[in-house]
Amino acid sequence: MSLDRKINRIQFLSGNSLKVIAVLTMLIDHLCKIVLQWLLSNYWGAMADNGQMSWERFREIDYFIRFDLQSIGTIAFPLFCFLLAEGFQHTRSKKRYIGLMLAFALISEVPFDIGFFSAYSRMEDTFPFYLKYQNVFFTLFLGLLTLVCLERFSCKSDLPVDRIKSAVLQVLSVVLFSGIAEGIHCDYGMQGILFISAFYICRNHRIYQVLLFLLAYMGATGNQPPLCTLLAGLLILLYNGKRGKLKLKYFFYVFYPAHILALYLIQVGLGNRSHNGFLPQCWKKVLH
């Protein structure tokens, strides 16, 4: 029995299952970055300074948030890239798919900017806009354009010269859109283009998809894949090729800007309550 057939026997995760896992792990990551790191910077450090909390305890919390919790969030992006490549193959209208991605990239930009970069945009007097970094939908949009080129330049001839020409054009497409993603500072940048391309190029062999994805990770970062990135690869191996019963087609599109805005409002609410002395008293009880 071939390796692909052995893997097929243990696949049980639908596309909806992967999407839910990706959304939950992304939520954990963004909760850390928007709310918990803000508390770390604005309150827990001050509490350690004035003796309300030990520095050892502060460092434990800092490590837990920045490394343990946020590492869970690294599972999300490879799953979204994989689902994008899958969606590209099965969509009825590629133009509509690309247009939808661009529309939500524009819709999500203000929530993304105020959620992650409000302090910087206020310093630069550009609030609520922060033009130096773009949300992940722009990365996915560029990824779709890359897939259009990969499909357009795929070789349908057995002639060596045609195969070489096709390969060169495909590589140049990946390089071009990777450069654009880096140039406009999209979230994940070149990594996103490489991941999406890897999942599409090896679309007929799941094990090769995951292996090329891991190679793309090492090529983009220069590092060995961490545990949670390997876990993302394992989850992709367990994908059964089915969409699932629930209709979650547009859920992520809406959830992405909505949850960032909600987390930012929580951050603002915590800041307002701090003026009444609520936070120092509350966290003193929690952290001791």
Question: What are these model-predicted stretches?
Answer:
Residues 1-288:
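Alpha-helical transmembrane segments and their immediate juxtamembrane cytosolic regions
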